[in-house]
């Protein structure tokens, strides 16, 4: 493992560290995110059943008009508010796990997470 670890890029190393922490035996629902240059995706996953419970992205009909040229703070606000709306309809009572993947916890990723936290969801 040590030899393999030396040949990985920084984002791949970060992703491995995060996966190791997420798979530490905690049975919680996971919010996974993915971002590209133009779009932002988030989904709530039940890892025990292997099912996506809900998802939201900048390609949704409600948000698509706001996201014309790429992702920015306004689109993240729209995506997070839509995710909060969908999660509150599900009436979750347990803590969630925030899976940021290989992304650093800065910028749009932290803004999305803080919006969820401010609405009462716990990671």
From Swiss-Prot:
GO terms for molecular function: 5S rRNA binding; structural constituent of ribosome. Disulfide bonds: none annotated. Part of the 50S ribosomal subunit; part of the 5S rRNA/L5/L18/L25 subcomplex. Contacts the 5S and 23S rRNAs. Transmembrane segments: none annotated. Belongs to the universal ribosomal protein uL18 family. It comes from the Bacteria. This is one of the proteins that bind and probably mediate the attachment of the 5S RNA into the large ribosomal subunit, where it forms part of the central protuberance. This is Large ribosomal subunit protein uL18. It comes from Wolbachia sp. subsp. Brugia malayi (strain TRS). GO terms for biological process: translation. PANTHER family: 39S RIBOSOMAL PROTEIN L18, MITOCHONDRIAL, LARGE RIBOSOMAL SUBUNIT PROTEIN UL18M. InterPro entries: Ribosomal_uL18_bac-type, Ribosomal_uL18_bac/euk. GO terms for cellular component: cytosolic large ribosomal subunit. Keywords: Ribonucleoprotein, Ribosomal protein, RNA-binding, rRNA-binding.
């Amino acid at each position: 493992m040590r030899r393999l670890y030396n040949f990985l890029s920084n984002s791949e190393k970060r992703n491995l560290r995060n996966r190791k922490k997420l798979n530490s035996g905690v049975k919680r629902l996971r919010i996974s995110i993915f971002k590209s240059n133009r779009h932002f995706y988030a989904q709530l996953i039940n890892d025990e059943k292997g099912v996506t419970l809900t998802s939201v992205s900048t390609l949704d009909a409600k948000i698509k008009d706001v996201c014309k040229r790429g992702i920015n703070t306004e689109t993240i606000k729209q995506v997070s508010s839509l995710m909060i709306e969908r999660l509150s309809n599900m009436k979750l009572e347990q803590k969630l796990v925030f899976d940021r993947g290989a992304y650093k916890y800065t910028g749009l990723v932290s803004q999305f997470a803080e919006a969820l936290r401010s609405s009462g969801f716990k990671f």
